[in-house]
Each structure stands twice: as C-alpha cells, then as structure tokens.
Amino acid sequence: MQEPSPKNKKGLYRLRRADPHERLSVRLRHFSFGAAVVFVVAAAGIVIHSLYNIQIKNGATFRQYAAQQQLLDSTIQATRGEIYDTSGITLASTSVVWTIWADPSYSTALFTSSKNDDTGEVTRTADPAALQEVSTQITLRLLSGDGESLDSVDTSSAAYQTQYQAVYDALSKSDSAYQTLATKVNNAIKLSIEQYVTAYNKAHKKADADKGIRKGRISVSSTKSFQRDYPYGAFAAAVLGFCDADGYGTYGLEKSYESTLAGVNGRTITLRNAYGNAIADENATTYAAKDGSNLVLSLDVNIQEVAERYLNEAISANNVENRGAAIVMNVKTGAILAMASKPDFDPNNALDYTANEAYLNELVHAEPELYGIYLKNEDGSYVTDTNGNKVLDPEGDYSGYYRDIQWKNKTITELYYPGSVFKVITAAMGVDSGKATINTTLNCSGAYGVAKETYHCAGKKAHGVQNLAEALRNSCNIYFIQLGQRIGSSLFYDYFDAFGFTERTGVDLPSETNFMQYYSKSRLGEVELASSAFGQAMAVTPLQVCTAISAAVNGGYLVTPHVVDKITDQNGNVIEEVGANVRRQVISESASKAIRQIMEYEVADGTQGGGGRAYVAGYRIGGKSGTSEQLNMDRRSDGDYKKVASFVAVLPADDPEILVYVMLDDPNNAKTDYSSILAAPVVGNIISEIAPYLGIATDGTDRSGTTVKVPNLIGNEWSNAQVSLNIKGLKHQLAESDASQAGAVVTYQYPRAGAEVPYGTTVYLYTDTYEGRHTEVPDVTGKSADFARQMLAAAGLNCIVAGDANGLVQEQSEAAGASVQRGTLVTITCG
C-alpha cells in the first residue's frame, strides 16, 4: 500500500484530530439554518395567507369593522307630521320631550366613601341627608309643570310622595350607571333640573386630598325623545288612533297613514375618539331627515263636538249597553265631517281604561260567550254549577278586552242588523227596477205568511192599503216583504251588491271589517228574501249603511267615504288632494229623486211618522228610523233579543248635502226600544246645531221678526223637551251641571212657558231642583251687533237687535254687571 504524500498526510492528520463536539456543532448549525429557513418561509406563508384573508378574501368585512370603530353613525330623527281638522285646528302633533336619568355610580355627593388602605377597596354608604335634599328638589321641579312654580307643588299629595320615592330609590342605587328618574318631561322642567344640578355641583365641589376620592358631585342627564300629543284628549279618538311607545302608528289614521306621517330619518357620519365620542370634523357627512307630511282632514271639530256631545247624552240617558256611534258625511263626495264611537279613550294614554272600566266590565259580562270569560276544565270543557250553568271566571283578567273594545271604531269594525233603515234601500231597488213607484199600493193585513214563516209589523198592527211613501212612514214590514217579492231574489241580490254591502267601503281607516254577513244569490230563498227586504237578514257596518243611503239620495252614485281631505308638507304646500271617488252609479237620478221625496215624507213637519222627532223647524229633512233585533247576539235576561236603535237623516231633502246617522247598540230605556223615540231626537239635535253652522239651505220660509210661544217643558224627559223646541224653531241648552241620566226630567226652564220669544231663541233646560241659574250681563255697548250677540250668547243670554243692525250698540236693556237668569232676552239698540 502506497503511503500518502506529505500533503495528504497533513490533511489526514488534521481530520483525525478534529474535536467530536465541533463536528456536532457544525451539524447543528446546518440544521438550525435549515430550520430557520423553513420557519421564515412558513411564517411568510402564514403572513401572506393572513394578508390574503384580510385584504382580499375578507377585506370588505374588515374595512367595515374598521369604519365602525373609527366612525360614529348618528340618527337624525324625522319629525312626525301633524293632523289637522278641515279648518287647520291641530288634532295631533309631535313635541320634544326628555327622559331625565341619573348615574348614581358617579354621583359621589350622595354617598359617603371610605378606602381600605391595605386592599384599596372603596366602600360607599348612602348619605340620607344628601339623597333627601336632591330627591326633593328634583321632584319639585318634575311636578311644577314649568320648572319654576315649586311653591305650588303639594308635597303632601299622593302624586308627590310617589314621584319622590321613585327618584329617591333610583338615586340610591350606588352601583348603577343608569337610572331613569322621569320620562316625557318638557323642556322647561328639563332646563330647570339642569340648572339645579349645575348649581349644586358648583357649590359642593371639593376633593378629599388624603383619600384621593372626588366628592361633591351628582350626575343627572337627559335624553331627547318625541311625544305624540292629542290636545283634545278623548275626541275623535277612534278616527285619530294613537302611537305606541316607539312612535309608530298603532290604530286609526296614525296607523293607516304611518308611512306618510313618519317621514324618513336622517344620518350624520363623523369620526369618533377612543371613548366613542364624536370628534368635531368639518368633513362630517350629514344626510338630512325628511320630516313627515301632514294630514288635513274633512273632519270638522265643531261638528265632531256636537255629534259626540249628543251621542254621549243619549248613551247615558238610555242606558246603552254596547256603545253608540254617529256619522256626519257629505253625501256627494263621501267626505266625513264627524265620526264618533262612544265611550272611547284618550289617545294621550291609550292603555288606560279606568274611566270606562265599570261600563266595559258590564259589556264584557253581558256577552260571556263572545269574550270567553267562562271557567274551563283542563280538557277544555266548561266548568258548570249544580244546575248545569257555566261558571264565570272570578279572577279573569279582562283588561285586554277592555282596551280592544274602547279602541274599536264601531262604525267600521262591528256588524249589526240595520232593520227598517234598510227599507230605504229596498224602496230604491223597487223604484229603479220599475217594480214600484211612489204611488204603488199594497195591502198590510197585520200578518203575512212566507213559506212556513209568518211576519208581522211592529205591534202586529194592520196598516191596510198604503203607497210606498206611506209604507215607509209607517215602517210597514209586510209592504216591503211584498215589494221584495216583486223585485225577486236575483235582482235583489244584484242591487244589494251594487249598493256596496258585499265589500268594504274603502274608507281610509284601518281595521274595516272584511267579514260580511249576508245570503249569497244562490242561498237567497223566499224566507231569506222576505227578511232581507226589511233589514233583518244581513249584518252590515254603520258606514256601509251611510254610503248606501248617500247613493240612494245623491243621484244614485256610490262614493268612497274618506276622512283625509289632503296631504301637505311641513310648509303647508299641498302634496296630494283627495276628491270624490265615484265607484259606480247604482240607481237613476229619477229613482233617487223619488227616494228623497219619500224620506222627506217620513220626517215631514215633525207632527207625523217615526221620523218626526228628527225635524228641525226651517229645514227640509228626509229620514228613516230603524229598530232591529240582533239575532247574532246573546239574548237579554228577559229572553228578548237585544235591539239596535238607529236613525239616518239627509238634508236639505230636495238636494241633500249632508247625512246624519246615529245608532245606539242595545239601549235599555225603561219605556221603549223604538228608534223613533231614542235615536231620531239625537239626529234632530245634531242637525239643529250643525245645519246653521254649515249654512245648509232652509225651507225658504222667512221667519225673521216672528215670535214663538215657549211650550211648557217641565215634567218632560229632557230629550222630549228638546224635540219640542226643535219643532218650534227654538234652540235648547241643557245646563252644564246637569247630567243626562236615564229618566231625567225637566224641572225648570227659562224662558218660562208661555213667553213670546223671537224665532231661534235658546231655552235653557234644567233637570235638577235648583230653580234658575244666573249669569252676569256683559257690557256690549260700542260693539258691533254680531259681536255683541256672540258675547251675550257666551254669557248664556238671548239677544234682540233693534235699530240699525249694521251700527254699533248704543244701549242694552239689561245693565252691564247685572245678575240675570240664563236665557234672559237682552235687547240691544244699534245705531
């Protein structure tokens, strides 16, 4: 074997002498380098993958997150539109209110604090004196009404004690950062509380240098919100509806026109700091709110007030069990001038039913099946007593029923049998179809058989031979059954459908019932036709009746009723105007003229017929009464069917402009159920006030300068007394202090019976035992005759103008300041 060269020997020698640890270190360095390369590559991959996910795959999402953290997006609340009556009087508006709240955890002045030097723990103990002082001052301001009249607050009242305790308890919660002290606070009170808090903090500010705990501060703040206000309270409530706590329309016009009234909220987008607060930034982006539009109604507050007043009186006087309704509408355009359902509610506090609770409780218990208030077993069967009678639930919560009932607009949500009012429609069918004329005579023998049924007129009276006008005045069931037979089932149904009874009226209000109760053409047999002809076989809504009667007298046109007349912007500019919407012509003009004639014959001059009690001297009025049995309801305790008394009138009868309708659901008058006695006077009373107000054409008779002898009304029920005055052309006023209770009779009147007074004089009626009320005569000298008349009327006095009516008052027959009886005639001499 050849030996290595010297050079190779040297290399071999060196290799053999290498340190084993050095060889390991080399290998480790190689491995570490490789691992580092792998780690760097992997990390780079992870970073690249993350960047891909963040920047590309989920870039939009993360950019959105970043924007949310960096930007503050604030809502600009749109102002809800207002609701006005036809003359611009505000019925619903929105006001700024404030929620007053406190941060007790930051209100160090209300607590005594101590710090444990070892643990650093701070213990807070309520300071009763401070809490009492602050709670008292805040409560006084909350109840002052204006933030200033603190001395006027009765600190001994229950209201004060309740509010004080609520504030005290809220401020006592030392660990809470948010406690509500009051809601719906007006701006004056809010400013007063802010001023008090600022002054308090300034006066009590100090620091505990030793403990390092700041003392002497209370933290009270406010949050802006909006409140819906209804200045007239329980007035046209079923029409207006109300808004919920969040400001959304829940019922009535507030609901049906929600999108119109609400407007569109705006936004402000700006940068915010680390604490989430907005940074002043000239580059902030603002999207202005679009305020809601206003509704201008066809409703007239003066007509609505008259309708509600007389409806309330009638409900009380006749012990009406299931509420009442009234409608005044323009027969040519469908514009609703008044719509009332009573009792109703105050939309400012729609959840409250306490004012009507007793009435509502009786109503619910009168229809236990309808409201499901019987006790039930676990299997769903009813609990019964030993006699097998169902047992009422003594602990039932009926509040939901109470609210639902008082919220309902009775004119569109509830069905009833119209009874004899429907005879107007049957007459229109007969005349238009050529099956009858005004002079068509038919015989009423007192009983009439159809199949196996025998029909009678009221009181089983035989009216004998009569024409159409006489039959309507006599409200003869047998005449109209025979007329229905002449018309026939098929044609009768076609007219019934054309008059709108098989569909909604289309009124611009929510919750109009979609449930119609009538016989289809195929099921309208001879008995069903007979009952339908006089209004006892179909259930309809009051508004359906009004639109159908309007069509019968306005030339034959079925119009869509509406409450909203126009929509305006916040500056009053008209955005949309609602005109008459004629759906179709149902009968001819000539047939409509005939219906107007027979309806006027029903009322005549107030001396004959069931409609005479709706007569008002000086006006041509057509009308029809209807006393119907409610076959779809539980019977009364005496076994008789519950009744509805209704009356509809149109005027002037020769060319009607308005319709007035009143219905009383289940009246319990001790003397009668007849609508001619119960409902007709209510309609007449409404007409007596609104006809002059609307300028309705009179009958053309010049009564200026004529006098009327005042009738003796003492001993008459007040409603009958009013009828007597309407017929004679005298106005009437029920004394304010007198409640129109059932059976109330007139105990005093002024002017007295037998007095000769000018046509149109107001007679004051009293139903208590106090003989006469006095009033102070105002000084009207120097005033115009019209203004003087208004001043005297406001004082409860009648007026006679002597001399030049265009001049100023020179003398007055009763001295200014004198105390005289209300109703006294004061002669003013003008020149």
Predicted features along the sequence, with ranges:
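Extracytoplasmic
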Residues: 76-79, 86, 93-97, 176, ...
